[in-house]
Amino acid sequence: MERTGVLSKSAIIEREPERQPGGERARHTVVYLTRKAEFSASHFYHNPDFTPEENRRIFGKCNNPHGHGHNYTLEVTVKGPVDPRSGFVVDLKDLKEVLNREVLDALDHRFLNKEVPEFFHTIPTTENLAIAIWERLKTKLSMAELHRVRVYETPDLFVDFFGEE
């Protein structure tokens, strides 16, 4: 199965841009750009400090050690000024490359508990997955500031992480 990779992008302008001489947008205009991607992974929920009964009661079917899978949707939002020369807040090729290398290559078609180091001792909930993705990206995005990581486990369940508050 081939990874679907990047699905779409969106940009939100924080406020109306001002014009500078020559028609260039003001450098202080902040734009939020979101790149969307999909990946498939499996996981299970288990806390070794809980009794078997507690694990079953708290995590239900998600406590099955054989795991279950999801087709996750990831949205990564960066923010920054619009470059007056290119018109971009970020070069999308660079952003796609970082997402592929740091996130999709590491998580796609993986059993998170057993194949992804962040989850060897951490329960791979959607909350913890969003935090782990943030940690993977926060120092790799030199082209713009990481603003938000959104992870959809299902179409009606997602987590937003904005970094440490």
PLM regions and their residue ranges:
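Charge-rich, low-complexity N-terminal segments
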Residues: E2-E165
